[in-house]
UniProtKB/Swiss-Prot annotation:
This is Putative sulfotransferase vep-2. Its main location: membrane. The chain crosses the membrane at residues 11-31. It is found in: Membrane. One of its GO terms (biological process) is positive regulation of response to oxidative stress. It comes from Caenorhabditis elegans. It comes from the Eukaryota. It is a single-pass membrane protein. The gene is vep-2. GO terms for molecular function: chondroitin 4-sulfotransferase activity. The keyword Repeat does not apply.
Amino acid sequence: MFAPHTNIMSIARVLIIIASISVICITLFISRPVTRESSIIIAPKTRDMRAEQIRLFALNAMVKANSHTLPPRSKNISAKNLCSRRMTCAPHNRRYETMLKVSPKYKMVNCVVQKSMSTMMTGAMCYLYDEKAYADSGRTFDDEFSTRFCKNKNEFSSVNAVRDAYNISFVKTDWLFSMITRDPIDRFVSGYVDRCVRISQKNETGQCNGCGLNMTCFIENEYKRLMEISFKRKTHRTMEDAHFFPQIWHCDLNEDLEFFEFIQYSNNPETTMMPQLEEMLKRQKVPSDSIRFIKNELLYKKSSHSTTGTPASRFYRSRYS
């Protein structure tokens, strides 16, 4: 005669357990940091990415590291006057680093520069090198950050090496050389947040010039490095140098500036950058399906190491105002 009561109690226990599990699952889902890509919400791929997101939101640590008074600014001085002394400014015309990605099929060459969509453009040029192989691999352009699908296949370190490999004339030809350029301040803030905030400080003496989260310290030390390398008093280069040295030092622009077409970087690529790139792709007779694939990657998918719009980016940009 106790069976109905026992059954009811058993059912109640099961319902309580299910409800508890549901609450735990919902709580875990809500508590996970997420990254937004257009209207899609995507959880971080790894625990490392979750830790990176936490660092990008840790404003208390950033404020504490930058609580000092900024050095006084020079007023009423033009860039021309400021750089009139040889040892004050770095030379404009200097070769530092060139990383070219080639699509022989469409006679396209793109020079990638760190913090100017280098990962995404590396993916785009690899896709144009062999659309079928890239599509069949199931990769996205963001995957190029960790492993390059076209490593040692379509990569060159000088414009002359590309010319020699494909017998390209030294005058204007049907080959298209391009480079994405970015506002220097925007590029600096993005690079600083990427290298000095997002990435865990594993080497306190070397990484970010040993300055941690202190941007003023970093700028002063990187300026010293820039001047030392400018006048060949120092030859050792760091990842920081690659991310912060002038864009015009890249891509052999000191000798081949007139051969390049420039695409203006934008945090909203749909408004400026993509129309320019699409016009170039059409000019080089890239099929509409391939253009659509590239647009989808560039417009609706975000690089996993992008720092745009994060509290860290907003804070460090405010230090300029």
